Amino acid sequence: MILTKTEESRLLDSMAMKEYGIPEMVLMENAGSSVVRLTEKYVDWDGAFTVILCGTGNNGGDGFVAARYAAGRGARVLVLLMGNEAHMSESSKQYRHVIDKMGIPVIPISRAEEGAPYIH
């Protein structure tokens, strides 16, 4: 696995979309599903309690996808959403809508410390 800096990730995403025509939602789907797939050898998702912290940028969309995949593997998932939802991209909003339909709880927070009571 290769880790990239924020600027590098943005550049790679931009290249994938502009030069190769890969839709933003496909990038989010790949990122979110990969998080769950790559952690399967460390996490038994079935019955696991999982908290996913999402922002309102496109990484938040990745997190919504990861929440969906974790729930699909039997995890009890809680999403903590930090930031102004009005700033979310349309792709992120669509994935947020999917997890809402699945009944995955999303709790808005304005500071990371506000999420502490939900982590047990």
Describe the predicted segments one by one.
Residues 1-48:
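Positively charged, low-complexity intrinsically disordered leader regions
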Residues 1-4, 44-53, 60-120:
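Glycine-rich phosphate/dinucleotide-binding loop and adjoining beta-alpha-beta core of small-molecule
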Residues 24, 35, 58-64:
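Short, flexible micro-motifs
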